[in-house]
Amino acid sequence: MRTFIAIDVNEEVKKQASEIIEKLMKRGFGATWVSEENMHLTLFFLGEVDEQKISEIAEHLCRRVRGFPSFSFTVKGFGYFKRKMSPRVFWLGVENTDRLMKLYEELRNELSHHGFSFEEKFVPHITIGRVKYYPDKWEKLIEDIDFPPIEVAVDRFKIYSSTLTPTGPIYKVLYECQFEGGLIRYA
């Protein structure tokens, strides 16, 4: 099954993100927009992993971060990744904190023991849309879009499965790892 590890964002972030999506749609942008219930900060995309292995990975990851201190990060700003001269992905910025990087590094180190490698630099962000089409002079149309700073408290991460459908992905929580509470299985 397709799997990824993520941190959920709060309702305030989801509401503000939906308002930005609405603006972009009204301005002529077409995208596969991320629904509020699917908004998250991806830590790792693991790809296809069988159920037995993901269970083992979840246990090891959770053990690795048991007692990790709770922390927060700030979602702030709006941006995009480009392909050539075209917008490819719209995102909300995440201010990188030492604790977020430490969590990422702990999980990455544990995942490396399970055969995963991640060469790309970690650029924390929250994807809100994968752009399909855009209007002429699109850069001018997004100059005024911004995202006010919103703090997100973190005391856990989740492991999700992702099923691709023609109407967009369906995410299902498989495991939740609470820093102080241990592993919860949903599968």
From Swiss-Prot:
Signal peptide: which range, if any? none
List, alphabetically, the InterPro entries matched.
Answer: Cyclic_Pdiesterase, RNA_CPDase
Specify the enzyme's EC class, one word: hydrolase
Reactions catalysed: a 3'-end 2',3'-cyclophospho-ribonucleotide-RNA + H2O = a 3'-end 2'-phospho-ribonucleotide-RNA + H(+)
Instruction: Write down the Gene3D superfamilies for this protein, in alphabetical order.
Output: Cyclic phosphodiesterase
Q: Which domain of life is it from?
A: Bacteria
Please name the catalytic residues of this protein: 40 (proton donor), 125 (proton acceptor)
Per the Swiss-Prot or TrEMBL annotation, the motif HXTX 1 is positioned at 40-43
From the UniProt record, which GO molecular function terms apply?
Answer: 2',3'-cyclic-nucleotide 3'-phosphodiesterase activity; protein kinase A regulatory subunit binding; RNA 2',3'-cyclic 3'-phosphodiesterase activity
Question: What family does the database annotate?
Answer: Belongs to the 2H phosphoesterase superfamily. ThpR family.
UniProt protein name? RNA 2',3'-cyclic phosphodiesterase
Q: Which organism is it from?
A: Thermotoga maritima (strain ATCC 43589 / DSM 3109 / JCM 10099 / NBRC 100826 / MSB8)
